Amino acid sequence: MNHSLRTAIDIDAPASVVWDVLVDLGAYADWNPFIVSADGSLAAGEQLTNRLEPPGGRAMTFKPTITELTEGRVLEWLGRAGIPGIFDGPHRFELTDVDGRTRLEHSEAFFGILVPFMRKSLDTHTLKGFEAMNAALRERAEARVRTTS
């Protein structure tokens, strides 16, 4: 049983600026409407503590493990509910340069026996959370570019 969410947004800022906003976990409370807090060390194998507040959904705290960190390009973590195979999801942020702008691809693939029961919530609340985070990240990165120009 699996299901995926994929979103993308173009940002009028260099990838280095977008990356700096994305990996400044301590500032999430200042701008991020979806992952309202995040704490931990950014290194492959390290565990984070994230608090999600999906629009219209139930808030939750989870402890994903960073599975990929490519400086300036990719941040991916694996979250799971309890034991493997119940409800697992690699959550991925990938930055690509596009003609002086940055494309953020924000996605998650969900696996496990609970996925069929969670699909409606994923397609509504979680997807809206991804989109809200993307828009807020764009706003914050573009504001940084404006203040340094």
Stretches with model-predicted labels:
Residues 1-43:
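Hydrophobic ligand-binding cavity/cleft-lining segments
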Residues 3, 51, 80, 118-122:
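Residue-level detector of alpha-helix boundaries and kinks
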Residues 29, 39, 55-103, 109-112, ...:
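Hydrophobic-ligand binding "helix-grip"
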Residues 45-50:
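Secreted/surface-exposed cysteine- and glycine-rich disulfide frameworks
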Residues 103, 109-149:
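A conserved amphipathic terminal alpha-helix motif
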